[in-house]
């Protein structure tokens, strides 16, 4: 599907960029693809990636999604875009909400507009469960990003740039996530700081995150939102699973929720569940393609939203301690940390 094509990954030196490049380099995709453009603002991370991966098909572009000209210039000749650049730390975005807006909303506007201007074939935009019923600046900015993508998708004619969204749960061991923090605290002999023990989060691996984007890329139609069905765990069980894996008896200290944190996350609202397609391991939420002349769209027999539940980290499959341990041991990051323990 990438034969002789050029792919751009915004925020390409982050966790997702590293994961998708690892997948491509271990498969035949890297042999088929014409070029992969890594677009990001951190020259040190780009240089580290260039040296580590050492592949002539990787091209590096310094720029910022906040700057339209830099993203537009880098997108000339691009066939596909994975838009992963974002500010994603919830407490940080609470203190600097305009920075979240500048990157997650206005930056996304620049990426989408540049893609349309350069006649890119398809764009996959990476979103988050925090965009569903958002209560924090990060989630609000990502919800607006989704709305931007869908609004632009609604205006596209057949044959024009296809815009799709993927919505993630918690990606385990990604940069800034809680698993690296817990492992660091275990290794340093410190207390494990847990915000709220009964708080639940979806558990996705970086492999899952790549699978979701590639699934959306292969199957996505104009304006689709894709969600991967994922299990969940409480934060306390996650911490105890890591303690057992590392043979740790560190004390646990409950510190209370941080700014903007929710008790549980939602990946699909009941409103979206009313129109979602169940694709087995995924939900597809099709775009509402109606215009503002609602009278001509009145129909009967639709699903009743009131009878449907949201898809949340509270009502998905809840993993017990043994199951969480087994899942964590499949992660390359955890295996690497075990070897270095």
Curated annotation (Swiss-Prot):
One of its GO terms (biological process) is lipopolysaccharide biosynthetic process. GO terms for molecular function: UDP-glucose 4-epimerase activity. Its EC number is 5.1.3.2. SUPFAM superfamilies: NAD(P)-binding Rossmann-fold domains. Signal peptide: none annotated. It catalyses: UDP-alpha-D-glucose = UDP-alpha-D-galactose. InterPro entries: CapD_C, NAD(P)-bd_dom_sf, Polysac_CapD-like, Polysaccharide_Synthase-Rel. Keywords: Isomerase, Lipopolysaccharide biosynthesis. It comes from the Bacteria. Belongs to the polysaccharide synthase family. Epimerizes UDP-galactose to UDP-glucose. May contribute to formation of LPS or the exopolysaccharide slime layer by providing UDP-galactose as a substrate for either molecule. Addition of NAD/NADP does not result in differences in enzymatic activity. Gene transcripts were detected at ten days post-infection in chicken yolk sacs infected with strain Breinl. This is UDP-glucose 4-epimerase. It comes from Rickettsia prowazekii (strain Madrid E).
């Amino acid at each position: 599907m990438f034969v002789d094509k050029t792919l751009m990954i915004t925020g390409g030196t982050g966790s997702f960029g590293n994961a998708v490049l690892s997948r491509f380099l271990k498969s035949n995709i890297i042999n088929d693809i014409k070029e992969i453009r890594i677009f990001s603002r951190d020259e040190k991370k780009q240089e580290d990636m260039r040296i580590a991966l050492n592949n002539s098909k990787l091209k590096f572009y310094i720029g910022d999604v906040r700057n339209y000209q830099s993203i537009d210039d880098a997108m000339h000749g691009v066939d596909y875009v994975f838009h992963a650049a974002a500010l994603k730390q919830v407490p940080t975005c609470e203190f600097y909400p305009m920075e979240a807006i500048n990157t997650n909303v206005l930056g996304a506007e620049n990426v989408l507009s540049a893609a349309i201007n350069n006649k890119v074939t398809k764009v996959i935009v990476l979103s988050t469960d925090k965009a569903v019923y958002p209560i924090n600046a990060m989630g609000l900015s990502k919800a607006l990003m989704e709305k931007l993508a869908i609004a632009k998708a609604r205006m596209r004619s057949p044959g024009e740039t296809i815009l799709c969204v993927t919505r993630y749960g918690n990606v385990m061991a990604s940069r800034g996530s809680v698993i690296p923090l817990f492992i660091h605290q275990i290794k340093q002999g410190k207390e494990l700081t847990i915000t709220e023990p009964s708080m639940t989060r979806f558990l996705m691996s970086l492999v899952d995150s790549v699978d979701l984007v590639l699934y959306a890329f292969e199957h996505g139609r104009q304006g689709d939102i894709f969600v991967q069905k994922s299990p969940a765990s409480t934060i306390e069980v996650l911490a105890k699973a890591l303690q057992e894996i590392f043979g740790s008896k560190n004390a646990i200290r409950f510190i209370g929720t941080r700014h903007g944190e929710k008790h549980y996350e939602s990946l699909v609202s009941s409103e979206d569940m009313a129109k979602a397609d169940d694709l087995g391991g995924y939900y597809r939420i099709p775009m509402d393609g109606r215009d503002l002349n609602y009278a001509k769209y009145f129909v009967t027999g639709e699903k009743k939203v009131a009878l449907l539940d949201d898809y949340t980290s509270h009502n998905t499959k809840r993993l017990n301690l043994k199951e969480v341990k087994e899942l964590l041991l499949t992660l390359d990051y955890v295996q690497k940390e075990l070897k270095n323990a």
